[in-house]
Amino acid sequence: MKLLIALFVLVNAVIAQNGYGQGGQGPYGGQGGFGGYGGLGGQAGFGGQIGFNGQGGVGGQLGVGQGGVSPGQGGFAAQGPPNQYQPGYGSPVGSGHFHGGNPVDAGYIHGNHHEYPEHHGDHHREHHEHHGHHEHHGHHRH
């Protein structure tokens, strides 16, 4: 039993230095205990709600370790942004390919249109002759 108490005192001293819930409500950690609300021991921490022997005992409501997993998850989340960058890099390349294909298609259509204007030339002349008649209509308007 003496060894366990000595270990607790040692642990508490180290935690006090790190600022992990100093003292709390009870003597040996209390509510803050070994990590307080989000540290190494979750809500109850190392000493439970009241301390060394209180309601939570040496494990409290969440025990030692659950809080420690949280920081690990945060580290993994950092890997997300680099992954997001890769799709961004790929997108412009795809866009470029699309752009290259479109102008060629447009060129083809333009070529076809060039053949039509020659045929349209005759039609345009006919329209010019009709315009002469239109001048007459203009006089009628007067």
Curated annotation (Swiss-Prot):
Skewed-composition ranges (Basic residues):
125-142
Signal peptide range equals 1-16
Where in or outside the cell is it found?
Secreted
UniProt GO cellular component terms: extracellular region
Q: Where is this region: Disordered?
A: 65-142
Q: Where is the composition biased (Basic and acidic residues)?
A: 112-124
Keyword entries, A-Z:
Developmental protein, Secreted, Signal
Compositional bias annotation for Gly residues: 65-77
Q: What does this chain do? A: Likely to be involved in the establishment of the head.
Q: What is this protein called?
A: Protein spalt-accessory
